[in-house]
Curated annotation (Swiss-Prot):
Belongs to the TIP41 family. It holds the Pfam family TIP41. It is found in: Cytoplasm; Nucleus. Keywords: Cytoplasm, Nucleus, Signal transduction inhibitor. This is Type 2A phosphatase activator tip41.
């Protein structure tokens, strides 16, 4: 059963739906749509959608995110334990699975779904006013969802989550994909949506980050909890190298 929550201010509304992971028949239907097995924990009914004057503008949806997972042979991570992942997906009584080429780490460039006809993001130099947000006081509203998560046959983690909060005059959303492939690399994509609720404009800040696994391990302090830090997405984000950064304004 899904739980719904929303917050409205002037012309803006943010809607959230959150539920449990997909059931087996739902996973099979999604696999048929995608052409590859979905992540172990796929929250297919979860979403966050932002509306302006009662019309959807931009949102984050599980199926849309997974549709952007690479499906070409060059997208497949060729590492020693890729076959271990494939074997982990065999059901009792099945033969070795036939899996079409796809990025089994579920890396996706998904930055949200534009829901409004004729709306488009235009690249600009303007930045999100971080200090104004920090000075705006405590949260008036907060919610978070997970779109999907997979432990990659105990060889790391792939997780896509979305968090949104409202402070006085501002709405801030962070959608984050973290793909950690142990002993190989760590990749992270962050999409921030910022809305000035008083002046009615929307910015999108997109960043891609990455580093080798060894580089991250070397930054763990002596005596630090390795497992906890590798699962701390904020800690990882601060230590990865930014390889791409673009900011857009939504025209609609």
């Amino acid at each position: 059963m899904q739980k719904q929550d929303d917050f409205s201010f002037k012309y803006w509304t943010i809607k959230v739906q959150r539920g449990s992971i997909l059931k087996s028949h739902e996973m099979e239907n999604l696999q048929s749509t995608l052409g590859f097995p979905p992540p172990e924990m796929t929250f297919g009914n979860n979403y966050i959608s932002i509306e302006y004057k009662n019309q959807p503008v931009v949102g984050f949806f599980t199926e849309d995110a997974l549709k952007m997972v690479g499906t070409k042979p060059e997208d497949v991570m060729q590492v020693s334990f890729a076959k271990d992942w494939a074997k982990s997906r065999i059901k009792p009584g099945e033969e070795y699975p036939v899996i079409y080429p796809f990025d089994w780490t579920y890396y996706t460039d998904y930055q949200g779904t534009i829901q409004r006809p004729n709306a488009k993001f235009i690249e600009i130099d303007q930045v999100i006013p971080v200090q104004k947000i920090l000075n705006a006081g405590q949260n008036l509203w907060f919610n978070e969802i997970i779109l999907f998560e997979d432990e990659l046959a105990d060889n790391g983690k792939s997780m896509f989550d979305v968090r949104a909060r409202v402070v006085q005059g501002h709405l801030i959303l962070l959608a984050r994909l973290v793909v950690r492939l142990d002993k190989v690399n760590v990749r992270l994509n962050e999409t921030r949506i910022y809305i000035d609720l008083l002046n009615d404009f929307l910015l999108k800040d997109c960043r891609k980050k990455q580093a080798t696994y060894d580089k991250i391990i070397k930054q763990i302090p002596v005596g630090g909890d390795k497992a906890a830090l590798l699962d701390d997405n904020n800690w990882l984000s601060e230590r990865l190298d930014t390889v791409d950064h673009k900011i857009y304004k939504l025209n609609f």
